[in-house]
Amino acid sequence: TTKAISIGSKVDEGDTVVTEKKTYARLKFSDGGEVTLKPNSQFQVDKYNYDEGKPGDDTAMFSLIKGGLRTITGQIGKRLNPDSYQMKTPTAVLGVRGTIYDAHFCQGNSCGSIAPGLYLAVTNGSVVITNTSGIQTTLQVKAGQYVYVQNPTTPPVVLPAKPDIPFNPPPKVGAAAAGPAGGPQ
């Protein structure tokens, strides 16, 4: 479902968060993870489960449908099974290993003169990226690397430099208060 949210709103499994022009959204999760959405983005919480006492049940499955985000992974993806975290995009699937990364899905002129496709910048940790076609092409992206995936059938390509896609969220997005012990906020 898609619903309007405000500071302190709870976002449930299946919910889609849409940011408008000049609007950022910061979602905080009960495992300590955080997602900051750029303006004109669409992000869905496909599945989320975190119980501090049951690391084997951890699940964080998200979809970046449109736009861009920065994420800091929480305990899910750092504990028992790092494959329990997954970020789907129209062109690739991302798995993390204790990570801070930016992902931007550019379509049309949403990123100015930058070519359409998925752009990934890893700040800390590493990301395993796989295109979404039947052709299984996987690449491990380390901190300081930049990757581009043009479409679901093209393999991820390491870029020589960071693409010129600005992401400058304000220092504080809404209230910095911690969310409830349940799911994402």
In which residue ranges do the predicted regions lie?
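Flexible, surface-exposed loop/linker segments and immediately adjacent secondary-structure boundaries
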Residues: 1-24, 29-146, 150-185
